[in-house]
Amino acid sequence: MTQLMITGDGNTPLSPEELADLIPNLATREELNEWERENILRAREWAVGDRTGSNDMVGDEYVGKLHQKMFDQTWKWAGQYRRTERNIGIPVQEIREKLVALFGDVRYWIANQTFSPDEIAVRFHHRLVAIHPFPNGNGRHARLMADLFLMKLGRPAFTWGSRELVRQGEARARYLDAVRAADNGDMQPLLEFVRL
């Protein structure tokens, strides 16, 4: 097993086939995290300048395009929905159907002001993570989607516990606990965490 295949709590393991689609020549998980971080920073810069409105970003095309921008220098499959089952997320054949339902729900929540903008963004993030549409990067993608959604509404991006969440540590553990609470219907811990 290579160092790249070793995952921590909350990290999605990749298949050997998915690992073979790594673009740069990296040997360790730390190198991969740093490479992806740089790729994501470029994607964030692109997304902040993008003129897509909040309603239009809640759709299949934008979700895939953002993931592609976030990982296009890292993975050949960037922006493509996963084709293999995971220890997290829904069955592969349900991904598109569940995303369409999520997009409809978010648009309804916006139009009817069902929840505050923060709660809509948290629920959007949580459902994206639960669906787990991509082979890797789902949490980072969902967090950036939530931040961009808020910014399009003129609100500040979330702080996400004011810590780096990719590496193992107290902030990541608290984030994962909040996501698991949301899995059980309690959104409050995640709502609190995103504004710490």
Per-region residue spans from a language model:
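FIC/Doc superfamily catalytic core
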Residues: 1-196
